[in-house]
C-alpha cells in the first residue's frame, strides 16, 4: 500500500542532483548534518543514522544482550516483524502484549504478564503516527525501546528510539533509519557497530567490537534532509486530508495527537472488505502471534479489532 505522496521542491531536487553528479554518494558530510538536525525531533542527545529502522532495532537488542544478558521483551503482536525478530535473534524472550482500543500497547496487560526473571524491556509501537500513548503506566524499572517507525517526533519517554525513513514514511529516503538515545556508552557502541565494528586509527582502522554494514550513506542522508525540511508542510496537508475524509466514511477513526505524524488514518469498521478492495489497501500488519514462526497466545482485544482495521492513506487525490 502506498501510504504517502512525497513532494520535493525544485531546489531540493537540484541539491540531490548536484550530490549525485559530485559522486560523493557513499560516505559524506550530510549524514552528520542530518543526525544533528534530527535532534530537534527526537529530543535525544545522540542520533545515529542507519540504513534502516530494522538495523537500528537490531543494534539495540545486540547492545541490550551484551549489557544485561537475556531479557524479557514485551511488545504488541500488531507490528512489523523485524524488530521482534531482532530481539528473538539475540536470545531475548518475546512476550506479546494486547492492545487497547486505539491499537496501542496495553499497560494493564503488560503488568499482568510481567515477571522479574530477567531485565524487562517494553517496546510500544506508535501505531499510525501517534507520538504518545495515553494512560502510559509502567513500574519504572523497565528499559523502554520506542518503535517510532511511523512517527519521527515521539513525545513518549524512552531509553532508545528507532525511526524509519523508508520511501513510504513521513520523512523519506531511498532507505534509512535513526537510532536515538541519551546514553553515551550505548551511542559509542552503535556508532562502531553500524560501521563493521571499526574505529579509525591514524593510518587505517581497528576492529574493536562486533558490527555490520548498517550505516546511512550520503545520498540517503541528502534525500532524507530535503524530506525533513518539507515535513511540516506535508504534515499540514495530511492533517487536512484526515479532517476531510472523516465525513466520507462511517466507523470509528483512531485518534491522533498534536505531535502525530498522521502517517495514515485508521478506521475501525465491522465490514472493511469493501473499502480495502476499492482502494487496494492492506492491513498493517499480520498478527505476529498467529504466524508460523512465533508462539501462539491469546490476545483478545488484538484479535477482535484486527479484522476491522482499515488503514487509509492521507493524500487527498485518493478520495
Regions found by a protein language model. Give the residues of each.
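Conserved PLP-anchoring active-site segment centered on the Schiff-base-forming lysine
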Residues: 59-115
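Conserved PLP-binding active-site segment in aminotransferase class I/II-type PLP enzymes
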Residues: 1-67, 229, 319
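Generic structural signal for small/hydrophobic residues in well-ordered secondary structure
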Residues: 16, 38, 56, 73, ...
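Active-site phosphate-binding strand-loop segment of PLP-dependent enzymes
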Residues: 101-173, 178-180, 185, 311
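Short beta-strand segments
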Residues: 51, 123-125, 223, 255, ...
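Active-site region of PLP-dependent enzymes
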Residues: 152-264, 293
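Conserved PLP cofactor-binding pocket of PLP-dependent enzymes
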Residues: 198-203, 244, 272-310
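Proline-centric
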Residues: 94, 98, 311-319
Amino acid at each position: 500500500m502506498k501510504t504517502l505522496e512525497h513532494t520535493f521542491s525544485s531546489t531540493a531536487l537540484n541539491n540531490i542532483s548536484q550530490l549525485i553528479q559530485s559522486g560523493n554518494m557513499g560516505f559524506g558530510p550530510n549524514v552528520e548534518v542530518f543526525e544533528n538536525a534530527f535532534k530537534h525531533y527526537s529530543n535525544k542527545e545522540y542520533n545515529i543514522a542507519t540504513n534502516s529502522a530494522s538495523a537500528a532495532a537490531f543494534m539495540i537488542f545486540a547492545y541490550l544482550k551484551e549489557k544485561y544478558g537475556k531479557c524479557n521483551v514485551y511488545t504488541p503482536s500488531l507490528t512489523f516483524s523485524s524488530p521482534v525478530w531482532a530481539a528473538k535473534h539475540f536470545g531475548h524472550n518475546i512476550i506479546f502484549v494486547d492492545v487497547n482500543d486505539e491499537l496501542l500497547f496495553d499497560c494493564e496487560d503488560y503488568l499482568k504478564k510481567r515477571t522479574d526473571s530477567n531485565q524487562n524491556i517494553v517496546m510500544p509501537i506508535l501505531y499510525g503516527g501517534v507520538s504518545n500513548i495515553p494512560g502510559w503506566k509502567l513500574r519504572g524499572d523497565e528499559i523502554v525501546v520506542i518503535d517510532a517507525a511511523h512517527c519521527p517526533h515521539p513525545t513518549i519517554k524512552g531509553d532508545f528510539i528507532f525511526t524509519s525513513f523508508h520511501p513510504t514514511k513521513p520523512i523519506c529516503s531511498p532507505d534509512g533509519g535513526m537510532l536515538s538515545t541519551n546514553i553515551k556508552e550505548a551511542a559509542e557502541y552503535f556508532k562502531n557497530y553500524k560501521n563493521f565494528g571499526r574505529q579509525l586509527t591514524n593510518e587505517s582502522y581497528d576492529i574493536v567490537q562486533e558490527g555490520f554494514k548498517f550505516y546511512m550513506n550520503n545520498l540517503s542522508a541528502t534525500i532524507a534532509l530535503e524530506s525533513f525540511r518539507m515535513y511540516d508542510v506535508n504534515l499540514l496537508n495530511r492533517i487536512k486530508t484526515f479532517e476531510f475524509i472523516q465525513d466520507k466514511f462511517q466507523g470509528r477513526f483512531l485518534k491522533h495527537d498534536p505531535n502525530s505524524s498522521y502517517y495514515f488514518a485508521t478506521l475501525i469498521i465491522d465490514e472493511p472488505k469493501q473499502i480495502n478492495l476499492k482502494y487496494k489497501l492492506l492491513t498493517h500488519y499480520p498478527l505476529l502471534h498467529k504466524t508460523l514462526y512465533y508462539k501462539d497466545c491469546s490476545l483478545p482485544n488484538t484479535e477482535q479489532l484486527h479484522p476491522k482495521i482499515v488503514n487509509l492513506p492521507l493524500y487527498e487525490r485518493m478520495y
